[in-house]
Amino acid sequence: MWLSEHWKDYELIDCGRGEKLERWGDQILVRPDPQAIWNTPRTHKGWKANNGRYARSNTGGGQWQNKSMPERWTINYGNLTFNIKPMNFKHTGIFPEQAANWDFAREQIKKAGRPVSVLNLFAYTGAATVACASAGATVCHVDAAKGMVAWAKENAKSSGLENAPIRWIVDDCAKFVEREIRRGKQYDAIIMDPPSYGRGPTGEVWKLEENLYPFVELVSGVLSDNPLFVIMNTYTTGLAPSAVTYIMETVISKKFGGHTESQELGLPVTETGLALPCGVTTRWTAK
């Protein structure tokens, strides 16, 4: 398991009974988490005294209750600053477990000793984009949601990177990659966080288990002749890490050699000293 254990402004205080107790800066939040299936004692005062709890409804969706948190605030991760805005579907705008990948990407970029171009697909609010730009990379940030790209720009500005070489694209990721291939555009590194399920711009259904292999084949077409790394996040519980490794090996490694490794991402739990699993990341590296 790759742990994101260098946070100061975020803390996973406790988890269990389908929920997690978190500290985001000075705000204490309770949010659902399907992985927290254990029934451990709730001894921390934050379970009862918090700034907001997201409660799921019986009909799907949910809402924030007992809200005393601001509409937005910022937290830092090293020299990066992120805007936190609790949304109607439990999310805050940052997945803190991804910090392990931000650290990995920055290390790869810094030690490359050459200019590095990164393509960030399904890029959400741009934490990975900002991390890579802070390490000196040129980044192309792609997400189909205009609001998420605007949020990502805010994160770049808050991190002092508003003038960094970042190309902001609102587009369907597959369609964009197809056009980049036709244009002959190439990238040294790719980061992608494909959804488990979704619909494309013309209503076509995306299912990760069915579409992942052809999508990896597609994006391999924009890798440069001297690629550095590929990071792919998969949050689908039914997809085994070894299956994702198999796909990366048969597509990326077949073309470029290198090494592929899949691991769970995890967050350390303060109250127990254990770790909460938070999805799977697969990393391909050239060496």
Role assignments for model-derived ranges:
Residues H6-E22, L29-P96, D103:
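Non-catalytic substrate-recognition/targeting regions of SAM-dependent transferases
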Residues A123, D143-G147, N211:
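Short beta->alpha hinge that forms the Motif I/post-I loop of the SAM-binding pocket
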Residues A145-I191:
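S-adenosyl-L-methionine
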Residues C173-K254:
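S-adenosylmethionine
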Residues G113-Y124:
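Conserved class I S-adenosyl-L-methionine
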Residues P227-K287:
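C-terminal catalytic and target-recognition region of SAM-dependent MTase-like enzymes
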Residues P96-R114:
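Conserved alpha-helix/loop element of class I SAM-dependent methyltransferases that forms part
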